[in-house]
Amino acid sequence: MGLVAELLLLRYLLQGSETAGKALEILPLFREWPLKGIPLFRLAARRSLFFMDNRRLFQTVVVRRFLLGSFPWMVAAVALLSVAQSADFAERRQRAANEFHDGILLLHASSELNASADGFHQDPYFYYFTGLENTVGALLAIDGKSNESWLFLPSHPPFLRSGLQPEVKAGPDAEKNLALKHVVDWDELKGFFASHSAEKVSLYFASGSFQFAELPGNLLNTKSPEGPAWLQLILQKWPAFEGKEAGDRIQDLMAVQSVEEIAALRSAAKSTVAALMAGIGAVKPGSSQRSVESVVEDACWRAGAHGSSFWPWAMGGDNAVFPHPFTSFGRYDHLNSILRPGDLVRLDVGCEWDHYQGDLGRTVPVSAHFDPDQRELWTIFVAAYQAGAKVLRAGVTIDQVFDAWRKELVNHRRSATSSLAQRAIESWSHRSQVPYWQVHTSNLATGTPVGPLRAGTTINFEPIASIDGQGFFLEDMYLITVTGAELLTPGVPYSAEAIEAAMGK
């Protein structure tokens, strides 16, 4: 195929997205340069249906030409990639507008500047629909009725006087770059709500998973008491509005990930494996939970991740029995204690990669050896886990995964020799006795799958149970496919013997 034909093909591929097609205006600037190129063009064209249906043709015809690269074409490719990424976020907002067609989805950027954190951490939902990681305090409004999105930016962004330029400024340039209809100063927010105040409009929002009420109930909107403080003021000023919590519905929109998201999750998972193995090696009698946590955090950074995706849990003894670990969020010491011989540790860790979360865990004996009763029960627990993991695939429900887990658990009823194992099997075979047993999604945040599992979703299979003050837990990350599930966290021990060997290294 000739050079001109290849250029025409590239133009056709890119014009599969109207937004990406506009970027072709820069290509004539580099007409005289050799087409040696760069695989980023594949990303720039990913919005094209033709490309999605003819991936191999695109790779063999075009990418073959763009193999070595030259600077001008690299500039062009980066520009095209930026446009394609903006188109991705626009597509996400379109899906949100369709989902919330009867109202307005409001997503608030993080406002907290925490000097004790490793950096600014953006609200995951705001980031998913904008891609803005350093924009503080902004508000995104996705109007389902008009099918338009508004980004309201603070008039005085933080540290502007100190020379820190905001990630994005209000105006037409930002609207073009972000593929957003309106990027304006938040002084216009009042007029935006006033223009909708004559209608009975639902204002959808997402509550934080671990946020506590900031005001007493008698000061909150009676129709939407669970709404955040900033929303309470809006509901008070315009009573026709009704706030509706929509966290699960937003998570469902995020559940099936793009190629780029899956790549980030693979990296998060890989670094999390390294962090967990480091944590296993740090568990010793007399050590503090804090000392293990610090080893895990350091291992995430050493593996190339952006630290931990959540502060590690190295919960020993009673601290590992649910729901006790949750109380660590409200404690200055994070339930820190000294690890005691004979106890089991819930080692639950995750590393963050490009905002995406890893999550992985094992039950670890403080003494570096399970006692005979613990060993028998752990062996049964692992067998049940593996039976549940085998049925993971698109179309399977969480109840079906539990049934497979329970069936294998009960199969060991007659062969179990210890009282601990026999009583555990009897108790755990009833769903009501293992209320924290779960399958959850993992991406920018964690969520609960809605309906059957879908291909392209990253999930964590995480049975959680306890007996006699001992917590048992096992967790891996999986990418759901049509035919099964790909384990994203290989290389971590399962058996008692393998865990003990890892502790001895």
Regions of interest found by a model, annotated:
Residues Y12-Q15, Q59:
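Low-complexity, intrinsically disordered or signal/transmembrane-proximal segments
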Residues L40-F51:
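Short, Lys/Arg-enriched N-terminal segments with co-localized hydrophobic residues
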Residues L7, E25-I26, P39:
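Alpha-helix boundary/capping motif
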Residues E6, L10, R46-R47:
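N-terminal amphipathic/hydrophobic targeting modules at extreme N-termini
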Residues M52-N54, F58-F66, S82-K505:
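Active-site neighborhoods and metal-handling regions in enzymes and metal-associated proteins
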